[in-house]
A protein has these predicted regions:
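N-terminal secretory signal peptides that target proteins for export/translocation
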Residues: 1-3
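Bacterial N-terminal signal peptides
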Residues: 8-18
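A generic structural motif
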Residues: 11, 109-112
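C-terminal partner/receptor-binding element of secreted or periplasmic proteins
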Residues: 24-47, 114-153
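Mature extracytoplasmic domains of secretory-pathway proteins
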Residues: 51-110
Length: 153
């Protein structure tokens, strides 16, 4: 049975577009470096966790995943990260997404209407210090407000 894309929930539709076929699935999310952040959202190890973590904000997350941004990068040979920003700038509308390939954990920051809308993990939990520099490039003020700690092994 075929389903029109308009019938799918927004985040599910975005993830379906981003997901490569099983034959194309990279063995590691690190192989996605150089692609837009939307590719990370469609990776098998990330998509389910992202869907669950975004909860009631799935539409907002789906919209932000489509925003333009620099190619994804890799930090410490285990984190792949990227972001997308509204043409007005990341301080207005944007999304930062990172994935720790060693612990299979996502890090997500969503900005809506100039304010942070979603933090995964929560704002009070420490983020890996390896992500401090990429976060400063995405949104310096939010990076300054976060707490960073050494990445767990």
């Amino acid at each position: 049975m075929w389903c029109r894309p308009a019938v799918l929930p927004p985040l599910a539709a975005v993830l379906a577009l981003a997901a490569p076929s099983a034959a194309q699935e990279p063995t590691s999310a690190l192989a996605l470096a150089g692609q837009p952040v939307l590719a990370l959202a469609g990776h098998a190890a990330v998509s389910g966790v992202l869907r669950q973590a975004s909860g009631g904000r799935r539409r907002i997350v789906a919209e932000r995943l489509r925003l333009p941004g620099p190619p994804m990068g890799v930090a410490a040979d285990r984190f792949v990260y990227g972001w997308g920003c509204d043409p007005r700038g990341c301080r207005e509308e944007g999304l930062f997404l990172a994935f720790d390939t060693a612990r299979e954990r996502i890090y997500l920051l969503v900005v809506e209407d100039g304010a942070p809308n979603l933090f995964v993990p929560p704002r009070t939990a420490p983020w890996p210090e390896t992500l401090a520099e990429p976060l400063r490039a995405f949104h310096p003020a939010l990076a300054a407000a976060l707490r960073f700690a050494p990445a767990e092994p």
